[in-house]
Amino acid sequence: MTLFPIFADLTGRRVLVVGGGAVAVRKTQALLQAGAEVVVGAPRLDPALAALAEQGGIARLDGGFEPAWLAGAWLVVAATDDRAVNAAVSEAARARRVFCNVVDDAELSSFQVPSVVDRSPLIVAISSSGVAPVLARRLRERIESLFDHSLGQLAALAARYRPRIRAARPDLGQRRRFYDWLLDGPVAARLRQQQPGLAEQELEQALRAPQAAPRGSVVLVGAGPGDPGLLTLKALRALNEADIILYDRLVSEGVLALARRDAERVPVGKLPGEDHDATQARIHALMLAQARAGRRVVRLKGGDAFIFGRGGEELEYLRAHDVPYEVVPGITAALACAAYAGIPLTHRDHAQSVRMVTAHCRADQDTLDWAGLARDQQTLAFYMGVGQLDYVTARLLEHGRAPATPFALIENGSRPEQRVVTGTLAELPEIARRRSVRPPALLVIGEVAALADTLQWFGQHQHGLPGPQALAA
């Protein structure tokens, strides 16, 4: 370790910034946030610094650098674009035993400013010892994605209750377990939900019940359509905090690979032909049992849990059984598959509305408004429609949708094996059969679907019926 990490209390202490440009602006703003009394010296100041000086936010020294500027300074930052000036600042600071940072010049610096993840009062600092600043920045971005912004509130709450926690849990082992519960349990969840009052109530109740059993919770997470890059930061955090993950059949391996390594993974996806209601009842029972055992449960569903995912039913069940829960939205298939196929779901010239429809219904239970669906100037996105293409096509044509209306079938949308098959509504069932389209696939119907022929940027694209050579193959 070539650098000793240290956090400096600069409140009310004089810090000199030499330089008046954009870099000096950034350094000055960071120092002011830390409570420093900042003095900026330069021949000219950036408008932002000039405004701060006029408002009394900083002190100003005009002209070129002079060693006398260092009088009374605890730290100095050299932020000019002239290395000779920066070297002079560094030498003068060294002679006076004042720590000096020369921006982007480790050789001239006696201290370095790290990349920072700020969840005050919790602060994470990352340094590459000046060797690879880009690497430090990348690491900071990764850490930023892992820690919710409510973490600072949680740290402040823990600090405020520290004496009471110590009194209520005098045994060190008990106290550690309590802090684990505090960081991972319902208090942290309430803060993430912007409910600080309820968070404090949870903490008060726990302190009044010294030996209370750990209380589990369920996070309903939308996994998106398959590309792990489309997972939200909150979803990633939930996967990294999970004790057990109950995942659906369409959740991709790439998404599961991002989960905590020691989390238990249980597939609960429904298979074609089985009793889906019975399977759903088993999922409900499993969520309840795991949460009551004090575990952090992630219910991981493809796409978004509230778009044809029975997420509402699962939340109703959890609420009825007094299980704490959260919901993390996911990118639903209609949005992601269309985007990866180059299809804008709305377009000023072609579609002023979008309708998301489930095609997973039997003819004797069909309550869809087919007359409304058959109107033009709208985009239809049919979920779970591969097995119902003949029925969907017949109903739309019967209610007046034009036979020449474009369609796009997006198979395995957003995944490496994505394939887009396009054509016209009249030929939809035949094209799908001849092209051997298989689930999972999203069906898009409307004028915008034709844009896939020119705008698709990802995966394979096949238009219309296969030619004789393809059929022979």
UniProtKB/Swiss-Prot annotation:
Query: Which pathway or pathways does this protein act in?
Result: Cofactor biosynthesis; adenosylcobalamin biosynthesis; precorrin-2 from uroporphyrinogen III: step 1/1; Cofactor biosynthesis; adenosylcobalamin biosynthesis; sirohydrochlorin from precorrin-2: step 1/1; Porphyrin-containing compound metabolism; siroheme biosynthesis; precorrin-2 from uroporphyrinogen III: step 1/1; Porphyrin-containing compound metabolism; siroheme biosynthesis; siroheme from sirohydrochlorin: step 1/1
UniProt lists the family membership as follows: In the N-terminal section; belongs to the precorrin-2 dehydrogenase / sirohydrochlorin ferrochelatase family. In the C-terminal section; belongs to the precorrin methyltransferase family.
PANTHER family given in the database record: SIROHEME SYNTHASE (PTHR45790:SF1), SIROHEME SYNTHASE-RELATED (PTHR45790)
Specify the protein name.
Answer: Siroheme synthase
Q: What EC number(s) does this enzyme carry?
A: 2.1.1.107, 1.3.1.76, 4.99.1.4
Identify residues that carry Phosphoserine.
128
The record's HAMAP family line, in alphabetical order, gives: Siroheme_synth
Q: Which organism is it from?
A: Bordetella parapertussis (strain 12822 / ATCC BAA-587 / NCTC 13253)
Per UniProt, where does S-adenosyl-L-methionine bind? 225, 302-304, 307, 332-333, 384, 413
User: Do the record's keywords include Transferase?
Assistant: yes
One of the record's GO molecular function terms: uroporphyrin-III C-methyltransferase activity
Active site, renumbered: 248 (proton acceptor), 270 (proton donor)
- Name the segments for region: Uroporphyrinogen-III C-methyltransferase: 216-473
Q: Which reaction does it catalyse?
A: uroporphyrinogen III + 2 S-adenosyl-L-methionine = precorrin-2 + 2 S-adenosyl-L-homocysteine + H(+); precorrin-2 + NAD(+) = sirohydrochlorin + NADH + 2 H(+); siroheme + 2 H(+) = sirohydrochlorin + Fe(2+)
